[in-house]
Amino acid sequence: MIVSPHKASRIPGNRLRKALMASAALVGLMSAGQLWAFNLDDVAAKAKDLAGQKYEAPKSNLPAVFRDMKFADYQKIRFLQEKAEWAKDKTPFKLSFYHQGMHFDTPVKINEVTATTVEEIKYDPSRFEFGDVPHDPETTKNLGYAGFRVLYPINKADKQDEIMTLLGASYFRVVGKGHVYGLSARGLAIDTALPSGEEFPRFTEFWVEKPKPADKHLVIYALLDSPRSTGAYKLILRPGNDTVVDVQSRVFLRDHVSRLGIAPLTSMYLFGPNQPSKVMNYRPALHDSEGLSIHAGNGEWLWRPLNNPKHLSVSNFSVENPRGFGLMQRHRDFKDYEDLDDNYQKRPSAWIEPKGDWGKGTVDLVEIPTADETNDNIVAFWSPETLPEPGKPFEYDYRMHWTIDESRFQAQELGSVTQTMRSTGDVKQSNLIRQPDGSVAFLVDFAGPALAALPEDAAVRSQISVGDNAEVVENNLRYNPETKGWRLTLRMKIKEANKATEMRAALVRDVPVEAAKPAEEAKHDKTAAKHGKAEKAAKAEQSANAEQPAADAASTNGTPATTEKVLTETWSYQLPADE
């Protein structure tokens, strides 16, 4: 009921004044809370301010005893879990910290954000057990934390496990339920694989929101800094079978860059079936990731098996508005790796899902030679065609999926590449002995529900393209009853071994063109029907149309018109130089 002001009861003056004062106080408190609440804008303001200043390289405060230690000694410095941040609070997430040591010689500032405060989490040496590492307690007084870990009961309700680690430059790693650490992500990559040298931006300060008891996510803010860039990042961590990280970024350039890497991923590939080990090894494969997957804006899916080349290799895949890309580990059986210690079958894939349109650019793949598995030698990122101008902010938001269920990030309506195998090419002689003929052979298995639904005698064929540096001597496609898919065998002779060779393949089949649907019968015009003229005209038109072939109907010789249907993702491979 609306009460007329003229009929409303009058409130005594003192009561009115008290009510107004209480309301004003409440509004003030609410406004203060809303104005104070820490968010990405606060970090972006710091980043913008930094971008207008000359870059100051971080200074190491590390005593020689920690700076010169070996990795085995660094591992002896153990964080005491009972002293984790929020250990005594009923929060689902806890934080533990990395001590400075080796090349982690510069501290990062870590802050706790609550509803009313932002306070630095100060370094405390009593949180660590140093074992037999010789050190003077006085030398640790002015140190800081090198980074931190996020703990969460992801596998067992009564056990806090690491689900995220942030240590070094702008690197971070994430796992889901049942995973072990594998590949890494970074905040930003600059001039990767260029002769001028790569610049590694660094997270210098973090703000972590203290979670409430019922929270299923953790919010982390980060400030990024480097000679030519600054940035503000918001990471929302959501643990689960697949752990998801939502990333918001606002970046400023101090100076021009030649190549910008957005959503960069870093991994390791030593050897596998498409590039067997040169040294005898009981493991069939050794890698954190085995291929780059790309879902282009036009709907195409591409699969690029990784290499450990003898020379630096950079591949660029032109994509407009990518729907997703990632470094993937598709093989998930223990027998694929046979490694009881490192469990490569449990190492996650990372899939980048852009939010919004990213425009024109390339997904870049960098492959670096490595002699062992301790070096990350694979990098993948999105590189925009138009580079931002210094001083002008740019934003890229995306979702990262850390998963061991790669089928969720493949085209359900297409077959996928399940393995790529390389072999010495040979020809079977009349005596049934196989004789090498100087060629190299690739066997590519395509499988999946879409292919399994086809009869084994379906007229499936391969569609291939090979660069000028190779001559194809065999292109053979066979049904594989073991996988209910098809196996493609490509054998080719390489013209110049010191050059890389590109090749692509997909499976297709011809399908009938759908006949054009007959036009809907015209409704009788009432006036024309009344006079009988419209009906007569319609009959004459129908008779004429019956004598004309439909646009896509059978040709004059009775053969149905067909169109080519793509059945699989595109297999794209580069045979490295000097292989």
Swiss-Prot record:
Per the record, the pathway is: Glycan metabolism; osmoregulated periplasmic glucan (OPG) biosynthesis
The source organism is Pseudomonas putida (strain W619)
Name it. Answer: Glucans biosynthesis protein G
Sorted UniProt keywords: Periplasm, Signal
GO biological process: one example = beta-glucan biosynthetic process
What is a single Pfam family found in this protein's UniProt entry?
A: MdoG
The residue ranges flagged as biased composition, category Basic and acidic residues, are 517-539
In the record, the note on similarity to other proteins reads:
Belongs to the OpgD/OpgG family.
Give the GO molecular function terms: carbohydrate binding; catalytic activity
Give the principal location in a single coarse category: periplasm
Q: Please give the InterPro entries that the UniProt record associates with this protein.
A: Gal_mutarotase_sf_dom, GH-type_carb-bd, Glucan_biosyn_MdoG/MdoD, Glucan_biosyn_MdoG_C, Ig-like_fold, Ig_E-set, MdoG_OpgG
